[in-house]
Amino acid sequence: MTSAVLRRQRRATFTVFLANGCGIGGWAAAIPELKRDLALGDGQLSLVLLAVALGAMLTMPFAGVLVPRLGGTGRLTRCSILAFVLVLSWPGAAPSLAWLLPCALLLGACNGLIDVAMNAHASDVESRWDGPLMSSFHAAFSLGGFLGAGLGALVLHLGASAFAVLLTAALVALVLALPAALALDEGDRSPVSHALRLPDRRVLALGLIALGCLMLEGAMTDWSAVYLDQVGGATPVVATLGYAAFSLTMLIGRLFGDGVRRRFGGPQVIFGGALLATLGLAVAVLLPAPWTAILGFALVGLGLSNVVPAAFSAAGQVAETPATGIAMTATAGYLGFLLGPPLIGAVAGQVGLRGSLLLLTLIGVAVALLALRQRKT
């Protein structure tokens, strides 16, 4: 493959991550307004988020089967990103919880496919590239999240509904995704279903690190705006800035992530990042006023920025094959991203949102301890 063609694949993959992040950012911005429009309680909202998680878990096991059937990771990425964009606005049009739950289930199903597909394709592109790329791809996702949340804040400022927020995010994501999806090559044709096999202890530890990290990231995606709204007393527009700050600092961290990992090493990056994220959560819990909580969420984003890329890179080195290790770690991390928000909602129903964030600090400490163990092995 010529360098020009490979650069084109890198740009296309980068843009797919960007489009997916934009959609997720729009979803994060729309959640408080959706909760308010349908008069949902914390427990009911946790059911909606659980439906998103369940939808993804139903489709993830089939990703490996679809790769060879569709002709490669690139083709699966193409189909799944377009499906994700198509259904993104549907939850905003739901007139009741009974309609919202199946829409959320379908959104989760499509997002589960695109998350597995684009990470598998990113791994294939990285294997053909001279140097690490994973942090830059995840930086694109963070940039998209910042873009989607920012657009959501603007639309809400104009007095629009949750449906308008999601539709705007979907249209922007479509403009980004369509040319990128058409530019993707076939990619790796081998199935990734072997990612569900029992991993060795090193890959298992990296999977747990990714699970904990993405559980925190999922909580920031789905609950940061709600926390600022209910606990901090922020206006709807200011409430969206929590996720925007989180995404912005995560983007900044990932832009420098490959160089930081080359200098300090993956385990050190994971350890320091987990501690910084824990500090940010503590700030948000102890100082819940809107601007101090937003500062805390920004620290969480900076801390988590390179944990997952570092875990993916390490898993690719210690597993039997790079694709196997990355797929195992990505699957564990994705489960954390999906299951974290409904878990936080369930805990919030018992002890409140501040208690839920306090629980997340323990997860941050656990990730740091796992990274410390990785440094010794």
Model feature map: region roles:
Residues 137-185:
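Helix-loop-helix hairpin linking two adjacent transmembrane segments in secondary transporters
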Residues 39, 71, 93-95, 233, ...:
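Helix-breaking motifs and short loop linkers at transmembrane-helix boundaries and internal kinks
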Residues 112-127, 305-319:
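Intracellular juxtamembrane helix-capping segments at the cytosolic ends
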Residues 34-35, 66-67, 154-159, 228-229, ...:
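Interfacial helix-cap and linker-helix signal at transmembrane-aqueous boundaries
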